[in-house]
Amino acid sequence: MARSLKKNPFVANHLLKKIDKLNRKAEKEIIRTWSRGSTIIPTMIGHTIAIHNGKEHLPIYITDHMVGHKLGEFASTFNFRGHTKSDNKSRRR
């Protein structure tokens, strides 16, 4: 279900403070975050945010096409390697 338009998009406070600080200094550095549920807002464009996928932080460069999406959409949490040849459980009978 989509978030109500009466509410603002969710962005973690600590992440918002770091973005604002970097925008004021006009610096570019990688921001590490565990907040996968934060929405990408226009002030994040041009920054590189390292998003935690459960094992490591994946650096993602934020572009204008990503605005409105969640950070977690760009860092997959699992790595599917395919079914094995002898795996009869997953085969269709």
From Swiss-Prot:
UniProt GO MF annotations: rRNA binding; structural constituent of ribosome
Gene3D superfamilies, from UniProt?
A: 30s Ribosomal Protein S19, Chain A (3.30.860.10)
**Any Pfam family the entry gives:** Ribosomal_S19
Annotated InterPro entries? Ribosomal_uS19, Ribosomal_uS19_bac-type, Ribosomal_uS19_CS, Ribosomal_uS19_SF
Q: Name one GO biological process term.
A: translation
Q: Which GO terms describe its cellular component?
A: chloroplast; mitochondrial small ribosomal subunit
Where is the protein situated, by its record's location annotation? Answer: Plastid, Chloroplast
UniProt keywords (A-Z) are: Chloroplast, Plastid, Ribonucleoprotein, Ribosomal protein, RNA-binding, rRNA-binding
The domain of life is: Eukaryota
PANTHER family listed in its UniProt record: RIBOSOMAL PROTEIN S19P FAMILY MEMBER (PTHR11880), SMALL RIBOSOMAL SUBUNIT PROTEIN US19M (PTHR11880:SF8)
Q: Which family does it belong to?
A: Belongs to the universal ribosomal protein uS19 family.
In UniProt terms, what function does this protein have? Protein S19 forms a complex with S13 that binds strongly to the 16S ribosomal RNA.
Quote the protein name from its UniProt record.
Small ribosomal subunit protein uS19c
Q: Which organism does this record belong to?
A: Ipomoea purpurea (Common morning glory)
Its lineage reads:
Eukaryota, Viridiplantae, Streptophyta, Embryophyta, Tracheophyta
Gene from which this protein is expressed: rps19
